Amino acid sequence: EFIDASFKENIGDPNKINLEFVIKEFEKEYLAKVNVFGNNITEEKVIRDNLEVDEGDPFNKILLMKSINNLKALNIFGKVDYNVTPTSDNDKKKILNITIEEKPTGEISASAGTGTSGGTFGFGIKENNFLGKNISLDSNLRIDEETIRGKFSVVNPNWNYSDRALIASIESSVTDRMGDYGYKTSQTGFSFGSNWEQYDDLYFSPKIAMFHEKLDTNQSASNKLKKQEGDYLDADF
């Protein structure tokens, strides 16, 4: 639609704000071409998938601004600029030039602490734009006096260009309390899910998780723990 919208606010009474929305039709113009510059790492497909406007569409300022905001919301660009120019042969046809500035998307974190239960050490590596496809990878490891826990997760926000996110993770943990309480537990498993907007502001997030858990005990364990000793398979949906 060839419309533009704006609003004016008028503060008359201290406790009231009057908003005036102005919607007007402007001259018919079309988007002839979209150019993308500065994406040395990010695939152009990632950028164009987040645009609300495309070549051949009616030129709409509202959708243009929404497109720019979509790119900024990806959080993989340090700067997003644009300009609109007419074509050389027709003022009614526009060329959209988008210039992005990519920023470092990898993160390394480390943590250490101590308390009444002993010391804790953590380490993590995260990448928010793997292979330039806007895929997030996250791995972390945490170690304390009794427990070792590790997790690796992948998030693809537009799996197979379906507008649906693919979320997968693998994790494992071992808690050894044989010396103090007579038991040791280990848990290993994975989760697999998706997320998408079915209707306006209505999202579906199905997820399945399966874990194998093992409990070992010795003679110093409580009778309750001894009865629970063995292997278990848990599944959640």
Predicted features along the sequence, with ranges:
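Sec-exported extracytoplasmic/periplasmic mature domains
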Residues: 1, 52, 72-76
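Phosphate-interacting basic helix/loop segments used at nucleotide- and nucleic-acid interfaces
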Residues: 1-6, 80
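Periplasmic POTRA and POTRA-like interaction domains that precede
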Residues: 4-61, 87-122, 162-164
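Gram-negative/organellar outer-membrane beta-barrel architecture
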Residues: 60-237
